[in-house]
Curated annotation (Swiss-Prot):
The PIP-box mediates the interaction with PCNA. It is found in: Nucleus. Residues 329-353 have a biased composition (Acidic residues). GO terms for molecular function: DNA-directed DNA polymerase activity. Keywords: DNA damage, DNA repair, DNA replication, Nucleus. Residues 187-241, 259-386, 404-451 are annotated as: Disordered. It comes from Chaetomium thermophilum (strain DSM 1495 / CBS 144.50 / IMI 039719). It holds the Pfam family CDC27. Residues 225-241 have a biased composition (Low complexity). Residues 200-216 have a biased composition (Polar residues). Signal peptide: none annotated. Accessory component of the DNA polymerase delta complex. The complex is required for the maintenance of genome integrity, acting in concert with the sliding clamp processivity factor PCNA. This is DNA polymerase delta subunit 3.
Length: 451
């Protein structure tokens, strides 16, 4: 029996819990009287090793003394109480009935409490804890823990007294309660509307379906008469346009009437269900006071979330299609550019590129290839690094830089030596006419000297 000492040491000494004899009997699957003895032995052995380490609470059952049962107001002198107008004394019809009391007493007040009892029928350890019991709420929590502890197997083996007619209800969520209530209402509705109509007790039940049928028929007539009136109020020119449009309008009116009739049918059983008295709970209170769940909001939220997810998927699919189209267009443009560049190459260079058969060492490709030069302009292609967005294996877009050929057409850069020669030539040409001018014109003084 060392298992109970380990269990109590872990719960009481290590985890500072209050353990009752009921909780111990259910946890270890032992008789309740055996659990009481276990608590007593553990309390005695632990206090023998270390005093005041474990504190007990006792349950005392017996008959208290007459003086203890009287209220404090009656203990004055002869027991009379001063009143303004005392009623006449009533004669004692029957003998005094003895009163028995059941009380939970801490360990430190046990001797004082036993002095108030005239006769004690039973006394045993109710619970043990690491601290002296000064708050009754701790015992209430321990009792709730006993109820929450699932009892597997037959509880009668523990000598627990159970009412055979009692029904144990498990507290479930609000949604399950609503489903159970709907199931009970449906079963009651089925019992009210039985299939065999020949029974004499179903005379009142027959009137309810008849009333619902009349309501449905009137609704169908109203729905059919409404479009008929609208059609008659329309101008005759529209009616003379053709019989095909009339046939379509009639079909639409019939479909609307069919849609409205199920709504009326679903409304009539709801009214019948409201008239059915719902069963009361075991506490005697009506179950309608309990807050019912509102599935409409949750369903609306679900539909909104579904719509948002569908829109996101549509947008993602559209983006993927656009990216694929862009990639295809870029690839086609690159292929067209390469084909045009190959066509522009001279015919002599093409066979030279195809002729070499022997393997040659790989040479680095030039950064620029000039295909033609005309009128001071040159045309060709050059290597350029371009960025591309590629979908990787995991479905993410990745930007990659790849070398690509780009065609260009630009002016030829002038050679560095020619500009110097051209700059000297006009300088010599400008100096020559200045010398000739000086010899032809002369000065003003020379003109006066000649005269």
């Amino acid at each position: 029996m060392d298992c109970y000492t380990k269990y109590l040491a872990e719960n009481v000494l290590s985890e500072d819990k209050v353990v009752t004899y009921r909780y111990l009997s259910r946890a270890l699957r032992v008789h309740v009287n055996t659990a009481k003895q276990m608590l007593f032995e553990f309390h005695r052995s632990q206090n023998a090793k270390c005093p005041n380490t474990v504190h007990a609470t006792y349950l005392v059952y017996g008959r208290k003394k007459a003086d203890a049962e009287q209220p404090s107001a009656l203990k004055n002198g002869d027991g009379d109480i001063e009143m303004t107008s005392s009623p006449p004394e009533a004669e004692s019809i029957s003998e005094a009935v003895p009163a028995y009391s059941l009380s939970l007493i801490p360990e430190d007040r046990l001797s004082d409490a036993l002095a108030d009892y005239d006769e004690v029928f039973s006394i045993h350890v109710y619970s043990i804890g690491p601290h002296p019991n000064k708050d009754v709420a701790l015992l209430a929590d321990a009792a709730n823990a006993t109820l929450n502890l699932e009892s597997k197997g037959d509880v009668t083996q523990l000598r627990a007294i159970i009412n055979p007619r009692a029904r144990r209800r498990e507290q479930q969520g609000a949604g399950l309660r609503a489903a159970a209530a709907a199931a009970t209402v449906k079963s009651q509705a089925k019992s009210i509307f039985p299939k065999p109509p020949t029974a004499p007790s179903t005379s009142q039940v027959k009137e309810a379906p008849k009333a619902s049928q009349t309501v449905e028929e009137t609704a169908e007539k109203a729905t059919l008469s409404a479009p008929a009136k609208k059609g008659s109020s329309a101008p005759k020119s529209a009616a003379s346009s053709g019989g095909i449009m009339q046939a379509f309008s009639k079909a639409a009116a019939v479909s609307k009437a069919k849609k409205q009739t199920p709504a009326l049918r679903s409304a009539t059983p709801a009214s019948v269900e409201e008239s059915i008295p719902q069963p009361l709970s075991d506490d005697g209170e009506d179950d309608e006071d309990m807050p019912q769940p509102k599935p409409s909001r949750s369903s609306a939220m679900k539909t909104k979330k579904q719509r948002e997810e569908e829109l996101r998927r549509m947008m993602e699919s559209d983006d993927e299609e656009e990216k694929k189209k862009k990639k295809e267009e870029e690839e086609e443009e690159e292929e067209e550019e390469e084909e045009s560049e190959h066509e522009q190459l001279p015919a002599e260079e093409e066979p030279m590129a195809e002729e070499p058969k022997a393997p040659e060492p790989v040479k680095e490709e030039p950064a620029e290839i000039i295909t033609a030069t005309t009128n001071g302009r040159r045309r060709g292609k050059r290597k350029v690094l371009r960025k591309k967005q590629i979908m990787d294996e995991q479905g993410y877009l990745v930007t990659v830089t790849e070398p690509a050929w780009e065609s260009f057409s630009e002016d030829e850069p002038p050679p560095p030596s020619k500009p110097k020669a051209t700059s000297l030539a006009p300088a010599t040409q400008a100096t020559k006419p200045k010398k000739g001018g000086k010899g032809g014109q002369g000065s003003i003084m020379s003109w006066f000297a000649k005269k």
